[in-house]
């Protein structure tokens, strides 16, 4: 799947669709890690860690810069991803202890 070899929009769209499937699969793996964190953390207050959140976003932005893609866009996406992950982890924390 090399976009440089595409000659039609159908190829572009098929490539994007495949990447989207892969991204969702990676998100499923990430959320599995959030379930593990919810199981391991001793109290609900430990779920939100602003220092770790900032570190994760900064790491993603640095990787974006390395790959020469817009770091500000990646930062905004990671802000949403981390907040969604925190919400998911809190729900899992509560579910496991109910």
Regions found by a protein language model. Name each.
Residues 1-98:
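Domain-level signature for soluble enzymes in the chorismate/prephenate branch of the shikimate pathway
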């Amino acid at each position: 799947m090399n976009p440089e070899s595409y000659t039609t929009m159908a190829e572009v769209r098929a490539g994007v669709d495949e990447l989207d499937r892969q991204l969702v699969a990676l998100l499923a793996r990430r959320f599995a890690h959030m379930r593990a964190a919810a199981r391991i953390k001793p109290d609900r207050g430990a779920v939100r860690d602003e220092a770790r959140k900032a570190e994760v976003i900064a790491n993603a932005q640095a990787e974006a810069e390395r790959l020469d893609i817009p770091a500000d866009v990646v930062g905004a996406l990671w802000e949403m991803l981390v907040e969604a992950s925190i919400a998911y982890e809190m729900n899992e924390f509560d579910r496991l202890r109910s």
